[in-house]
Amino acid sequence: MARIDEAAQRLGLSEDALMESAGAAVTEVALTELGRLGEHAAGPGGPLARPPLVVVLCGPGNNGGDGLVAARRLATAGRSVLMALVADASRQTGAATAHNWNVLQAMAAAGSLELFVAPTPELLLRLRERIAEATLLVDALLGSGASGPLREPIATAVDLVNATRTHARAAGRPCSVLAVDAPTRIDMTGGSHSTPVIESDVTVTFHRAKAGFALDREARRLAGRYLVAPIGIPLEAEEGIVPDDGEWPPSRITEVSWQEPVERAEAAHRAGGGIPAGPGRTD
């Protein structure tokens, strides 16, 4: 949604405000998912043996910035949080992202959360055992600006997320993956995906659903439950970008019910559930 983001900023909505709203939506969905997992664990197997660990994996762009906000908010809400920056810290150059990164560093120094920087696969693999303890994994690695084959250390992060989810399920332990905007890496315009690709249980995107998920059944499967969250973008920011069909973005977090079959020509304009399609936040 890069063009819409830029238009919203020209109207006076700051990048920091957009990122804060997106991170708040991710936090709300994460807390709901943790509640669901806790209820599941309270069945015959008994309650969770220890407080659930939330692992937030962040890439270097705006998508990662949304993850930084979510990590901060989850830690502030009293959750056990491990935040891993899967990039060189020097790439945190955007003003909003850099601000949130600085706040997280201060929180980590105070013991409010665990924070790691893993710009190489080798450093990321040192966290393998800790990541494997996660009850909820938040994928904030890449946004819509990514293209081509996955590069390291992102590819290793994708493998770790999928392995953690698979092994937890095999052991009967509650574990879910929450994707920010889209699982890494699904093309939000056409629905194609990288190899490897994260398989999520729930995806939260922002402002409007993305056409790629209406176009591709496999993309929908990989996304899991697909939620659209408002982040305060005015309709005026869409002028000349999203066709005006009279449909409004949701006023609260809303799950999309995809309509089958979806014609490609229609889906290029509408992303199911009456929500027009639009590009996602950049990586």
Predicted regions: what is each one?
Residues 1-53, 259, 267-270, 280-283:
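An N-terminal, well-structured beta->alpha segment
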